[in-house]
């Protein structure tokens, strides 16, 4: 059969320096507008090479393995097999150009979505699950230098009087994320977060800037006016005169604490009845900007 096919023809169009569908900064992005990877061309038999091409050859101008132009991953090519979704996408399909749940091109998952720093995001501390939005997807980290805005159950950003009590109606529950924003005062001595049940303290988080000329974080629980055994943490991410973000993620059997988007410590529940923990007390040598909570 007469054919102008040659090896040069088969290799033409493979020099695209920035092929569509190549893994981007967010990992394996879906192929750009085109068909399902490996889909046949319109009217072709499954597995048949495109007209004028060699079996296994990439479409003209494309990168090997790239989906042919015109479709979205999961979408049948025009004129395809019976049962194919009409042009425009499959029911429930994400709009062209994005993967379900993916941020728009050129944007970072917004800092307004409550999130606990998670190990799935490069550069974050290990030891905690990622969550929707999180402790950041279930959480990407918030944009560098940005803090989440106050959530639907929080207090609008602005100076708050310290000591300050944040009501927690219904108590705390797993996947509740509490976010505290503020600035450490110069020559600070201490700050404290106290998750309270009446006069009891379920979780006492107490960074101390100068205890015997050392900086240390002390965690504890107070039941019936008696303090339990202290748990001490040597890592100390707070600096006098500098802003901070504290995030406390409630899990079924422990609290997780992150500071400035990095996981810091975990504290197992000593008080088991979480719904009775109805208030968060914030005190110490800080200027408090906001305190909020949200479910993630």
UniProtKB/Swiss-Prot annotation:
InterPro entries: ConA-like_dom_sf (IPR013320), Galectin-like (IPR044156), Galectin_CRD (IPR001079). This is Galectin-3. Its main location: cytoplasm. The degree of phosphorylation is higher in the cytoplasmic form than in the nuclear form. In protein isolated from a canine kidney cell line, 90% of the phosphate was on Ser-6 and 10% was on Ser-12. The gene is LGALS3. It comes from Canis lupus familiaris. CDD domains: GLECT. Keywords: Acetylation, Cytoplasm, Differentiation, Disulfide bond, IgE-binding protein, Immunity, Innate immunity, Lectin, mRNA processing, mRNA splicing, Nucleus, Phosphoprotein, Repeat, Secreted, Spliceosome. GO terms for cellular component: cytoplasm; extracellular space; immunological synapse; nucleus; spliceosomal complex. The modification Phosphoserine is found at residues 6, 12. A motif (Nuclear export signal) lies at residues 272-287. Residues 164-294 form the Galectin domain. A beta-D-galactoside binds at residues 227-233. Galactose-specific lectin which binds IgE. May mediate with the alpha-3, beta-1 integrin the stimulation by CSPG4 of endothelial cells migration. Together with DMBT1, required for terminal differentiation of columnar epithelial cells during early embryogenesis. In the nucleus: acts as a pre-mRNA splicing factor. Involved in acute inflammatory responses including neutrophil activation and adhesion, chemoattraction of monocytes macrophages, opsonization of apoptotic neutrophils, and activation of mast cells. One of its GO terms (biological process) is macrophage chemotaxis.
